[in-house]
């Protein structure tokens, strides 16, 4: 197993710290490996099948295409491993956002819900905000916000389909 810290650009392209789209895993031996992508406050996803890594040869996999072979946990029937969005008539797969407490669930209500974590971040004050890089910034605009326009709580509610008791589950 090997890990590599990378950046996910707004357009979904994964790059290394220098902005290169080719991600290197050092001295990982040639072989077949599943690739997993994780991002703060998002569900992780992985390839359904191992990819063949050959030393000196780039291996590409586009997680965003609707036909990408992404792992689906057969015991989870409440949601797919990714969320599909349509931009200019083209469908793209995206990571589910909102797993603020990183427990593998996106919950709006109930115990260990992600909504309450946003409220705690702003000090329990409904109209307060907190700026900076944080897991509570679900919409990734640099501000954790519970109420008002561009609040992070609404993203959670949209992801659970507007049904307060719905729970999304990570497929890893």
Question: Residues of each region from the PLM?
Answer:
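Cellulosome-associated attachment modules in secreted, modular CAZymes
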Residues: 3-172
């Amino acid at each position: 197993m090997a890990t590599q810290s990378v950046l996910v650009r707004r357009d979904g392209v994964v790059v290394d710290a220098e902005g290169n789209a080719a991600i290197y895993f050092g001295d990982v031996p040639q072989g077949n490996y599943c690739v997993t992508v994780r991002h703060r406050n998002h569900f992780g996803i992985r390839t359904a099948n191992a990819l063949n890594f050959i030393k000196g040869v780039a291996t590409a996999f586009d997680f965003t295409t609707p036909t990408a072979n992404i792992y689906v946990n057969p015991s989870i029937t409440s949601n797919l491993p990714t969320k599909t969005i349509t931009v200019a008539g083209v469908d793209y797969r995206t990571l589910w956002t909102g797993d603020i407490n990183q427990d593998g669930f996106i919950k709006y209500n109930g115990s260990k819900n992600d909504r309450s974590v946003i409220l705690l971040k702003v000090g329990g004050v409904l109209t307060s905000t907190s700026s900076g890089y944080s897991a509570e910034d679900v919409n990734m605009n640099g501000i954790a916000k519970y109420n008002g326009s561009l609040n992070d709580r609404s993203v959670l509610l949209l992801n659970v389909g507007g049904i307060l008791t719905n729970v999304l589950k990570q497929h890893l």
